[in-house]
């Protein structure tokens, strides 16, 4: 029979009871530095999420392949089949729109996944616990995603633009305004399109459903307009053509699909207004609904 060991003396409790002068109770002082959280912390958290998720790299990789690959392929085919002087009045930047039309689906998908995937996995509860301000969480997601989407799109379209100008030797030289619209303008527009997808993902809370809705919004107006043959539907047909997303994207390359509708920088202001309205609605819903 072994002799029981005497109890070990307890370690002294750290003196965290600093107390304030004149207070009858001691005040607790945390051994860990405590700082007031702000938007920068939420942005840092969302940046860690978006760059550590494997789907981000895959989606952006496919986007680069589509935009650059199709843009260069179209330019090469046009140059190979063009006769002398046939491209004299064409803007060489305009051939980059074909790859961007398909590539925008990747940005839409990534935008939806940035928010909706957290609802699918349940991680949104952890996110909201760490940052109880729901509007701050959505704002941080929007800022990080917009920065990523704009940067990748701008680099892609700039590479395609420079390559197409050198490949299409018979085309005219783009003006400064055309360079701005064909690189900066279209990049902002695609990033805003992805931002609308992000907001829709937070509203729908279902990845497949939100992606389907966004692809429908991109393609359905143009497809529906093609089947409106009657004269009574001519007004609706023209509106669908003029304000469809493919038509608005083509405006940045001065090759609009229609003679009417938005011109110049109008598509960018339209997208900005729709994004602001959608974001305000999403914040309102986020404040009222449980996660």
Regions found by a protein language model. Give the residues of each.
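Junction motif at the cytosolic side of a transmembrane helix
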Residues: 2-16, 270-291
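Membrane-interface helix starts
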Residues: 48-65
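Secretory targeting signals
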Residues: 5-34, 67-109, 139, 143-203, ...
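Helix-loop-helix units of permease transmembrane domains in multi-pass membrane transporters
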Residues: 113-147, 151
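Cytosolic juxtamembrane amphipathic/interface segments immediately preceding
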Residues: 40-52, 257
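Transmembrane helix segments
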Residues: 207-243
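Hydrophobic core positions of alpha-helical segments in small-molecule transporters
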Residues: 59-62, 139-140, 210-213, 270
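Transmembrane alpha-helical core residues of multi-pass small-molecule transporters
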Residues: 62-66, 144, 156, 160, ...
């Amino acid at each position: 029979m072994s002799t029981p060991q005497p109890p070990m003396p307890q370690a002294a409790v750290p003196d965290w009871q600093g107390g304030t002068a004149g207070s009858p109770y001691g005040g607790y002082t945390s051994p860990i530095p405590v700082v007031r959280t702000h938007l920068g912390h939420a942005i840092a958290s969302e940046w860690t999420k978006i760059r550590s998720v494997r789907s981000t790299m895959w989606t952006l990789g496919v986007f680069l392949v589509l935009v650059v690959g199709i843009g260069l392929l179209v330019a090469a085919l046009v140059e190979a089949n063009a006769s002398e002087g046939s491209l004299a009045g064409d803007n060489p930047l305009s051939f980059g729109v074909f790859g961007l039309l398909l590539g925008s689906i990747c940005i839409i998908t990534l935008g939806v996944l940035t928010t909706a995937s957290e609802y699918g996995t349940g991680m949104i509860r952890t996110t909201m616990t760490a940052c109880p301000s729901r509007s701050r969480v959505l704002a941080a997601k929007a800022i990080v995603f917009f920065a990523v989407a704009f940067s990748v799109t701008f680099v892609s379209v700039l590479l395609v633009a420079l390559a197409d100008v050198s490949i299409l030797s018979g085309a005219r030289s783009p003006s400064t305004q055309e360079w701005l619209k064909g690189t900066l303008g279209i990049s902002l527009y695609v990033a805003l399109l992805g931002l609308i997808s992000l907001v829709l993902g937070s509203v729908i809370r279902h990845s497949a459903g939100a992606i389907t809705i966004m692809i429908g919004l991109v393609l359905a107006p143009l497809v529906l307009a093609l089947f409106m043959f009657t004269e009574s539907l001519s007004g609706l047909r023209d509106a669908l053509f003029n304000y469809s997303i493919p038509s608005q994207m083509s405006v940045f390359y001065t090759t609009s699909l229609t003679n009417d509708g938005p011109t110049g920088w109008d598509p960018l202001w339209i997208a900005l207004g729709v994004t602001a309205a959608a974001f305000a609605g999403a914040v309102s819903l986020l404040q009222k609904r449980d996660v």
